């Protein structure tokens, strides 16, 4: 991820979350996207 892609992922966490995160619902997707960005 670049910094821009990271921000985009955080901004659309419900869509850009990892598969495992998405399986946990919106909150899981948010965490998945944020962890990937970091």
From Swiss-Prot:
| UniProt entry keywords in alphabetical sequence | Antibiotic, Antimicrobial, Bacteriocin, Secreted
Indicate where this protein is primarily found.
secreted
According to its UniProt entry, one GO biological process term is:
killing of cells of another organism
GO cellular component terms attached to this protein's record: extracellular region
Q: Which domain of life is it from?
A: Bacteria
Localization recorded for this chain is: Secreted
> Signal peptide: which range, if any?
none
Q: What does this protein do?
A: Bacteriocin active against Listeria monocytogenes, Pediococcus, Enterococcus, Lactobacilli and Bacilli.
The protein, known as: Bacteriocin curvaticin FS47
What is the scientific name of the source organism? Latilactobacillus curvatus (Lactobacillus curvatus)
């Amino acid at each position: 991820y670049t910094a821009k892609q990271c921000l985009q992922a955080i901004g659309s966490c419900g869509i850009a979350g990892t598969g495992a995160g998405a399986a946990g619902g919106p909150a899981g997707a948010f965490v998945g996207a944020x962890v990937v960005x970091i």
